[in-house]
Amino acid sequence: MGNRTQQIAGIDKKDIMNRRLADNYWKKEELKLPDHYRMISAGAFQDNIRIERLLLGNRMEALGKDSFRHCIALREARLPHSVERLGEGCFADCPRLREAYMSQNLQAIPNSAFREDRRLEKILFTRDCDIFRIGKDAFSECVKLPAILLPRKVKEIDDRAFYRCKELKRVRFPEGLIRIGKEAFYFCGLESLELPESLEILDEKAFFKCTQLTEVCLPTHIRRIEKWVFHGCSRLKVLEIRHDPEYIGEWIINKAARIRCYRGSKVDMYCQESGFTVEYLE
């Protein structure tokens, strides 16, 4: 390498906290790093048993994959607004993590970021943050999470993003959301749905076994309703579809529910072919 400074993602090596350096902080309950650090490398603090709180400097830009995975004492993760990137699984499997505060400049919540954080109760985003995507399994099995207000710029909620979040009763979906992925809200506690008009794709089993839902009205720009979207929603009485999507998959509801639509529409034909009870709109 000669005298050339080593870099990772445009960051000098001397400004990266790696696993070897992290060992110097192994017994700290409050992690406060020197201000010059701009990145924490993959797995740097993984399996730490002491850290309870993070106090990261205002030059920190990136947290690597699994950087704080399975930090069993971690209770609060507060990211400075300088953080732009999180690695996959960065806060996964933290059994005592209760609160997480996201950075203003964060671009996305990566895959498995908070997966199986079973005591997570609060996830806060700044009003105008740049997050456009919630990754696969990002909050999967966060069983204590009661509500979430998604950032205004989110376009996609990827597969299993909130899988089996059993206490999740309220979600504010942003106008501009385009896709809700496969099993994104599988077996959640949602009591009602207000989906934005921008929504185009409801992927397979998106709201499977959301047993508290009783009535849902779909926005009129949805192009694809994949199979089993509301199947297993045992209390669902009515699914209202006021337009003709390009595609409707099989068994989108239970037989006990009914579909409210316009007489003679493609949705009406789908119901007749599938044996679903129909209620006609005036």
Regions found by a protein language model. Give the residues of each.
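Structural signature of tandem-repeat unit edges
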Residues: M1-D15, N24-M39, I49-A62, I72-R85, ...
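Eukaryotic intrinsically disordered and solvent-exposed regulatory patches
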Residues: N18
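Consensus positions within tandem repeat domains that build extended binding/scaffold surfaces
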Residues: L21, A42-A44, G64-S67, G87-C90, ...
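A structural signal for leucine-rich repeat
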Residues: A92, F114-R115, A138-S140, Y163, ...
